[in-house]
Amino acid sequence: MKLVIIEPLGVDQDKLLSMAQAVLPQDIEITYYDTRVSDTDTLISRGRDADIIAVSNLPLNADVINGCSNLKMLAVAFTGVDHIAMDACRQRGITVCNCAGYSTAAVADLVFGMAVALYRNLIPCNEAVRREGTKDGLIDFELEGKTFGIIGTGAIGLRVASIAQAFGCRVLAYSRTKKDVPGITYTDLETLLKSSDIVSLHTPLTPETRGLIGEKELSSMKPSAILINTARGPVVDSAALADALNCGKIAGAGVDVFEMEPPVPADHPLLNAKNLIATPHVAFATREALVKRAAIVFDNIDRWIKGTPANVI
């Protein structure tokens, strides 16, 4: 049986292969690629003989899936699978397993890093000190007593809710499924947007969530509110968000995800928006989280080989 790790998984190669060998059967043949490529022919060449492919967030389209004729199992080192041609996998009976839970703490950390940075003007303060300035014009807000709106209460959303409560925030939530968690008040999306001082997105990308936050939704938010997106880029209309920031419809935003994987083009509307903190899709990527993720990948593969698959999509 052949396993192809088709792109780097964020863990040192020697450590990654050691982790794989400690879990998987000794007779499995492992091929590791230490570069990311995007062209279909090269991806097919890498995966053509594989029974199992491990991939992170590298897009695998239907041509790649169908070009890997031996493929039986796809181990996705990511929570979302919107970058995978799932219809092609289903048509061929390929098992697809994801990694859930590895980045819960990491993503929540970045949410509050962004919230505090925006609320306390950390970037302008840093710039002021470096140009021999003072705090004039930079005194802003604290989180305590604010209303923190969470869209999507999966594991990450609930972690964010817990931390928000620790900061002394009132927590509102809007989600497809409601959880009976003390301190969280569920409401409709319109009420959440109108009432919240901070809005944090934690939804998967689906036909229903694509463009969930657009011009209408942004216009309903408080002028003093901030929006944080560590979920999926297309959940938010980027042009509408840039306009809302530049026109003062909302006060600030933290964005870790875009319509494309970084590098983000220099002419992207958000890169020229006022009071925006942008990060290159790093919310999930701490050293601890990437090791957890690799462990889940190999456990998923081992369980599939044994006939007891887990985390099947």
Language-model segments: which ranges?
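Rossmann-like dinucleotide/phosphate-binding beta-alpha-beta segment
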Residues: 14, 137-223
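Rossmann-fold NAD(P) dinucleotide-binding segment
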Residues: 59-71, 86-88, 208-227
